[in-house]
C-alpha cells in the first residue's frame, strides 16, 4: 500500500470532525469539502477554490491536475450560475468532471457553497 500524506489547513473543524483538508495517496489527491468567504455564491466559490488550490499545491498538484469536482449549494435555482461561473473561471482549461447538488444546509448558516476536488498526477 502506498503511503498516505495528510495535508491540514489548520481549520478548527479538522480535529473536531477527524479529517484532513486533503490526502495524497500515490498519484491521487482528494480534497475535502471546502467552504469559502464572501457574501454570495460567486465569492464563496472563488474563495473555496483558492483554498483547494493551496491544499493541492501542498500535495504537489495544481488545479490543472483536478479531474473531478463536486459543488454543493444551498439554493441551486438562485446560486448555480454564480457558483458555476466561478468554477468555470478556475477550471477553464482543466474542465474536470463536475456535479452540482443542492443540500439543505452547510455547517454554518452563512455558508452557501462547499466544493470538493479530486486530482490525479500523471507520471512525468
Where would I find each of the regions flagged by the language model?
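Short, polar/acidic, helix-capping and beta-turn segments at strand->helix junctions
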Residues: 1-124
Amino acid at each position: 500500500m502506498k503511503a498516505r500524506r495528510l495535508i491540514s489547513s489548520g481549520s478548527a473543524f479538522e480535529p473536531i470532525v477527524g479529517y484532513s483538508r486533503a490526502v495524497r495517496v500515490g498519484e491521487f489527491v482528494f480534497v475535502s469539502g471546502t467552504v469559502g468567504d464572501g457574501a454570495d455564491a460567486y465569492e464563496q466559490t472563488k474563495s473555496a477554490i483558492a483554498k483547494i488550490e493551496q491544499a493541492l499545491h501542498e500535495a504537489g498538484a495544481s488545479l490543472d491536475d483536478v479531474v473531478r469536482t463536486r459543488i454543493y449549494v444551498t439554493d441551486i435555482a438562485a446560486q448555480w450560475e454564480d457558483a458555476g461561473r466561478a468554477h468555470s473561471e478556475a477550471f477553464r482549461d482543466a474542465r474536470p468532471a463536475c456535479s452540482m447538488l443542492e443540500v439543505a444546509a452547510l455547517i454554518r448558516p452563512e455558508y452557501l457553497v462547499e466544493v470538493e476536488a479530486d486530482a490525479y498526477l500523471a507520471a512525468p
